[in-house]
């Protein structure tokens, strides 16, 4: 997700 580790995948 947007605030996940990868941002937006």
UniProtKB/Swiss-Prot annotation:
Where is the PTM Arginine amide found along the chain? 9
Kindly list the biological process annotations in GO that this record carries.
neuropeptide signaling pathway
For this record, the Gene Ontology CC terms, alphabetical, are:
extracellular region
Query: Which UniProt keywords are present, listed alphabetically?
Result: Amidation, Neuropeptide, Secreted
Highest taxon listed in the record's lineage: Eukaryota
Q: Which cysteines are joined by disulfide bonds?
A: none
Record localization: Secreted
Role this protein plays:
Myoactive peptide. Stimulates the contraction of the oviduct and foregut.
What is the protein name for this chain? Locustatachykinin-1
Organism source for this protein?
A: Locusta migratoria
Supply the source organism's classification: Eukaryota, Metazoa, Ecdysozoa, Arthropoda, Hexapoda
